[in-house]
Amino acid sequence: EAPQNKGIDMNRCWQVGENYTRYTSDRNYNGEKGFQAYEAKALRDFLIKNKSQNGQTILVDLHGWTQQLIGDVKICSYYEKQFPENNKSGVGRYGTGYLVNWARTYLGSSAGAAKSALIELPKAGVTDHQSVVDKKFSNRYITATLDMLKSIK
C-alpha cells in the first residue's frame, strides 16, 4: 500500500488519536496514514480482539539492534537486570508511532491501563546468528520474561 513501492516501517506506524506523525526518511518511512502497513493493521486487530477484558494486559515488543529499553518502568526493570548494557534513557517514555505507545492507550481493560515495553537487543559484537547464541540473548530474554510474569499478582 506504500507509494512508489516503498516499504513502511511497521515500528513507527501505530497511530494514537486523530493526529499522525509522518516520518519520510528511507529508514523510518511510516506511510501517509496510521496502519498503512497491512501487518500492523492485522496485528492491531488481533491485539484488540484478544486483549484482557478485566485483567492486566502486558505487551513486550522485542527487536534489535539499538540496545535500548523503552516504556513501562516496572517491565523494563526485569530486562535491565538481564541486559545491563542497554541504554535506559527511554524507560518511562513510549515513542511516537511505536506499538508500545499504542498498546498502553488502546489495550487497557476494566482493571486499568495496559503496560508495555520495547526491548531492543544489544548490538555490540553481534555479527551473525552464532554471536547471538554466544551472548545468550534468548536465555536472558526468557529469564527476564519469566521473572516479570512471576511477579504479576
Label the predicted regions.
Residues 1-93, 118-122:
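Active-site/substrate-binding loop(s) of hydrolase catalytic cores
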